[in-house]
Structure formats: C-alpha cells, structure tokens
C-alpha cells in the first residue's frame, strides 16, 4: 500500500491552533472541517524548545479512540525529520450530529486519553453513540472534501491528507450499518447549497450515500439499504428509485415511482426523480406536467424550478424557459466548513518518492501578471450553488438558439428600460394615477442580490460601462431590463402561464419584470461571449496567416473554463491542450480527460488518469471519488485485463503506474463488473 508523505505546518508561538479550533466550534454549520492532527516535537538530543506542527486529514478511521491513536502512532517516525522526535499528539474529529469535537490525546511514550469538547469549550466524556456519529461524519467528509481531479479543492486548503474511508466490503458493511442507524437524523447535517431546507431525503447523508454507490458501483448494497429504510418511511422511495436507475434496473424504478406517487402524489423528490427520468428518455411531454406539479408541491425550492426550466429548454419553449428561470428562488451560497487557522510560522510540504515525476511537475506555475486583465475579470467562474446552475441553464439556451435570438426572446417577455420610460411618459401625459398591471412581477421569494464583484462585467440600470466593455466585435450588448426591486415582503413565486402558444408579449401589460440577479446574469454572459468571440476570431486569423497564437498557460486555462461554461467542449479541449503543452495543469488534464471520455478514447483516458492520480498522490490525496468512478467505468466497459495492460504499457516510471494499479485494485476489492476478467 503506497502512502503519501506527511505535510507539516508549523504553528506560531503566539497562537495555538487547537485553541482556535475550539473557539471556531460554535460557528460550524454543517459537516464540520477536516480532522486536525496536532503534534508536539522536540530535538532528539536535548529537551530544548518544543514546537507544534499540524496537518489536516479526511477519511481516517474515526470509529474509536484506538483507531485515531493508531494514526498518530504512524507519525512518530518521520524520514524527513530525523533531528526531532514526537512527544505527544492530538487528533480532533468533528461530530456534526451532536456538535462535539471528539479528541484523542496520545503521550509518546505513555497514555491515551479520549474526550469531547462542546461549543462552549467544556470537556465531556465520549460515549459509544458519539463515536458512531463521529465515524459516519468522517466518511461523509471524506467524500464531501474530496477533489474531483481538477486540483481546485486540494489547492483550497494546504496540507490535507485524503484517505479512502471504505476500501473493502467489510468497511462498507460498517459504513452502511452506521448510516442505517443514524439515517433519520441525517437532516441535522445540513444539505447541498441548492436545497433550502434539509429533509429526510435531501441532506448530506443521502448525498454521501448516493455518491458512494455511484462511485463504487455497489448498487445492490444501496438497494438493500434503501429497501430496509423504505419499510419505515415511504419517502425513501425516491432514493431507492435513483439507485435502481443507476444500477440499470429501470423497470423496477418505474414501477416503484408509480406506486409511490399514488401514495404520495405531491412528494416533490419523487416527482423530480420521475421528471428527470422522463427527460433522460426524451419524453419532455411527460416530464412537463410532472415538473409543474413538483413546482406546486415545493415552490420555495430551487431544484423544482430548475427542473421545469430544463423541460422547457428541451421542448424549445424559450420564452417559458426564461420566465421559469426568472421565478427560481435563489439562495446565498454557503461554502463548506473549512479550517480558520492563523498564519503559520512556516510550511513544510515534503514529496513522497513514489509520486515524483517530472511530467507532472507544476511548480513552475506562472503568476497572475501574465494573465490579461479582461480574462481575470470574468466573474462567471466564481458562481456557486444556485447561481452556477442558473447560469448553466442560461448558457444552454444561448448555445441552442444563439445570443441574438436570446436577446429577442428576452425583450419579448421582460419589460425593457427604453419601453418602460416610453410607457411612463405616456402615463404621465394621461395623468393616470392608478398602478399599472405591467409593474406586477413574477417574483421570487429570494431577495439575495448576488451581484458579481467584477466591475467590468455587470452594470446596474443607468450606469455607464467602463471602456473595457465597449464592443469591438459582433456580440451585441444587451439592453437593460427593468428589474424587480427586492422588498421585505416578497410573495411566493407563481408558475408561468400554462398555455404559451397563445401568449402575446407585444403588449406592455403582458410582460414581466426581470429579477435583478437574472439581469446580472445576462450582463455576465455578455462578457463571457464577448471574450469568447474575440478569442475564436483571433485564433482563426492567426491560423489563416499560419502564425502561432500565443497565450500564457494561465490564460489557456481560463479560456478552457470559459469554453466549458459556454458548452463548447471542442474549443475547451483545444485550450486545455494548449495549456498542457506549456506546463502540467491538473485542471487542464481533467478537462482533457472529459474530452477523451466523450470521444471514447480509452488509451487517452488512461493516460490522463495516470497523470491525475500521480498528481493527487503528490499533494497528499490518496482518494478522489471522481477518478475512482472513471477507472471503474473503464474496467466495466473494457475489462480489467485490457485496462491493466494499457496502464503497464504507458511510458512512465513504474512507481507512477503502481499508483493507478492501486486505484484499479479497489474495483477488484469490490468485485465491480469487469474486474473478474
């Protein structure tokens, strides 16, 4: 078993990271931060000054104090530091169910003490129930804080060791047993940012369970768990149906959905699952009425409105798609709980010899000074949660009908600034004092104005755009709409009119007010399209003149993200490849991996996968669910023998190939389809 090196962050003498973690307990909202491991070291040949070092961990076995003490004991010997010795260690693991920080103190040599600390800093005794909860939270954090291969999560928090919490069927039984025992308390853990109110089937526990089943392909285990839970509460049917669909048992899924909806006709998770399934089969006509009923059953949830918008997009009812998008309730994005640590005295990031390879060296990354200001100002890359999903839907419409047609539809359904002024002048001339029906908006309950901070991308009504936003290409700048002004009392959103074929938007009275956040999205999309058009035009001109089109690696990375946001996969792959030709980039390699998946290029997929896995190991991550899923699907489709042969034939050092063989070994341990061959 190849393991990563151990990062060391040296704490400043004036601050204790353990005390700061204790102070931050009361501000934790959901699953909590990664585990903290704090060691005290002193020189081997003297009893001189002691120094505190720490790192973070996800995925370690937190089922008992003994397992955490065992982890600390693995850190006693360090091949990178032979002048100091470890005298004590403290392992802190957050229990999100009971809002306690479980701690194990190990004296070396000496005793082991376990206890827990509450939000007030009081020291309490740890019970068996506490350890069960802590173990489950630890597994869920391992999946929640895992990197998708792009390196974004790894770069966000320095010095985190990531382990796979479930490496065999025995560990799986332990995990699923804990999940079954604590399932009905799962709503206490919170939920993904797209969910307004965590409930029995939409929370971090159910998300983690579905993620585990999808990653490992252990559909039978997931079905068995949810079938048992469904006997206690029929609401679990939506989760069971999703696992049936994942496991290619669609007939059972359809039968289950039919029975469950007869029992609970207004259960929105069931309706959403059914609508999603109908959409995947190209039956938008069936999905439409289901999605409408889902909106009625949960009008304050973003997911139901987003699904209805997807249905309208698939039916090419662009006006209804925009009106539905305008009605989406938007939520302020709440990021995952992360460590809030003081500035360290210094940081030591040793590299394991098994993960060292010149080809994946990204240490020569260039700085921001080589990135054009216009590229750095693109704010769409910062969208998260509901705003990211809404932007994705808007860009999907743009890809299918074009920017000009989108602006035309927008002006047909929303009140534009120019016509509002004209209408207001007419009203003043007629001395009309009654409120016009045209100012009644299709309102969202959210009053959040998630205005992107980039100055050059978004303008409020009446503002003058900066010179950098002036058009120098063929992308027309959108006119401003009249936006709905947020108020303290906002009515619940109402579904758009049900019969779009007979709607006429030519009259001012039939139009809607555009929510401010959606108006902002149009302006951000305009800036994305403007930069994209300039890039493609310049690239074509250079190509026609047989000249090299030069950008820095960071610029190619940004352009790849831009094309990906705009649903231009071929252009994105071109940018990723140009970036990788200059230096290794995990984000670029993850983009190329997606391109190889799309093209069905098995050798290309495995080549990208080997390099990504090695880069992950280099930065202390032994586990990425996304990469496990990719290699599992390859083994399922091509067979384990072929996959192993292609890996072994790759012209990279053997110790690098062994890291990928270790990932493939997980599939054999779980007896995944294709691993027997």
Residue ranges and their predicted role:
Residues 1-677:
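Non-TPR docking regions that flank or precede TPR/alpha-solenoid scaffolds in eukaryotic proteins
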């Amino acid at each position: 078993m190849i393991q990563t090196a151990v990062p060391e962050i040296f704490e400043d003498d004036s601050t204790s990271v353990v005390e700061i973690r204790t102070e931050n307990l009361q501000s934790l909202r959901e699953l909590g931060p990664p585990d903290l491991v704090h060691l005290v070291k002193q020189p081997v040949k003297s009893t001189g000054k002691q120094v505190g070092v720490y790192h973070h961990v996800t995925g370690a076995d937190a089922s008992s104090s003994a397992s955490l003490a065992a982890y600390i004991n693995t850190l006693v010997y360090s091949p990178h530091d032979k002048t100091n010795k470890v005298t004590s260690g403290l392992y802190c693991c957050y229990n999100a169910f009971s809002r306690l920080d479980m701690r194990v103190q190990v004296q070396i040599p000496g005793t082991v003490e376990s206890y827990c600390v509450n939000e007030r800093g009081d020291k309490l005794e740890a019970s068996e129930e506490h350890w069960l909860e802590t173990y489950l939270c630890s597994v869920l954090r391992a999946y929640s804080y895992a990197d998708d291969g792009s390196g974004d999560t790894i770069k966000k928090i320095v010095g985190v060791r990531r382990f796979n919490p479930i490496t065999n069927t025995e560990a799986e039984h332990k995990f699923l047993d804990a999940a079954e025992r604590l399932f009905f308390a799962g709503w206490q853990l919170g939920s993904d940012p797209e969910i307004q109110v965590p409930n029995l089937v939409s929370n971090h526990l159910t998300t983690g369970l579905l993620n585990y089943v999808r990653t490992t392909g252990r559909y039978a285990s997931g079905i068995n768990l949810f079938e048992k839970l469904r006997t206690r509460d029929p609401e679990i049917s939506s989760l069971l149906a999703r696992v049936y669909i994942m496991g290619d048992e669609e007939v059972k899924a359809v039968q289950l959905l039919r029975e469950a909806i007869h029992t609970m006709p207004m259960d929105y998770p069931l309706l959403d699952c059914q609508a999603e399934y109908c959409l995947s089969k190209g039956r938008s006509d069936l999905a439409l009425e289901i999605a409408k009923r889902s909106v009625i059953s949960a009008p304050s949830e973003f997911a139901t409105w987003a699904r209805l918008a997807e249905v309208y997009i698939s039916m090419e009812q662009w006006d209804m798609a925009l009106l539905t998008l305008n009605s989406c309730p938007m939520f302020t994005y709440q990021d995952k709980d992360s460590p809030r640590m003081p500035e360290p005295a210094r940081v030591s990031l040793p590299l394991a010899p098994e993960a060292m390879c010149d080809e994946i060296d990204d240490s020569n990354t260039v700085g921001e000074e080589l990135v054009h200001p216009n590229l750095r100002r693109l704010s769409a890359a910062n969208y998260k949660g509901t705003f990211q999903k809404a932007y994705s839907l808007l860009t999907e419409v743009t890809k299918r009908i074009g920017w000009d047609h989108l602006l035309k539809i927008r002006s047909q359904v929303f009140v534009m600034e120019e016509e509002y002024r004209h209408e207001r002048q007419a009203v003043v001339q007629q001395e009309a004092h009654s409120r016009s029906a045209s100012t009644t908006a299709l309102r969202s309950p959210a009053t959040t104005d998630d205005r992107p901070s980039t100055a050059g991308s978004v303008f409020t009504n009446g503002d003058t755009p900066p010179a950098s936003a002036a058009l120098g290409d063929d992308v027309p700048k959108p006119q401003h709409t009249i936006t709905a002004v947020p108020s303290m009392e906002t009515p619940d959103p109402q579904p758009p009119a049900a019969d779009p074929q007979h709607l006429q938007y030519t009259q001012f009275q039939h139009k809607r007010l555009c929510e401010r956040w959606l108006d902002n999205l149009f302006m951000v999309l305009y800036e994305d399209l403007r930069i994209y058009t300039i890039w493609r035009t310049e690239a074509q001109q250079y190509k026609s003149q047989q000249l090299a089109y030069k950008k820095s690696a960071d610029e190619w990375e940004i352009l790849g993200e831009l094309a990906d946001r705009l649903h231009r996969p071929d252009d994105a792959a071109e940018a990723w490849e140009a970036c990788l030709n200059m230096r290794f980039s995990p984000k670029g390699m993850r983009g190329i991996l997606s391109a190889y998946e799309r093209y069905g290029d098995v050798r290309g997929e495995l080549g990208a996968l080997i390099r990504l896995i090695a880069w992950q190991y280099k930065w202390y991550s032994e586990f990425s669910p996304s990469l496990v899923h990719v290699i599992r699907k390859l083994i399922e489709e091509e067979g384990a023998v072929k996959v192993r042969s292609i890996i072994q034939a790759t012209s990279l050092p053997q110790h690098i190939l062994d890291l990928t063989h270790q990932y493939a070994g997980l599939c054999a341990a779980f007896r995944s389809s294709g691993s027997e061959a």
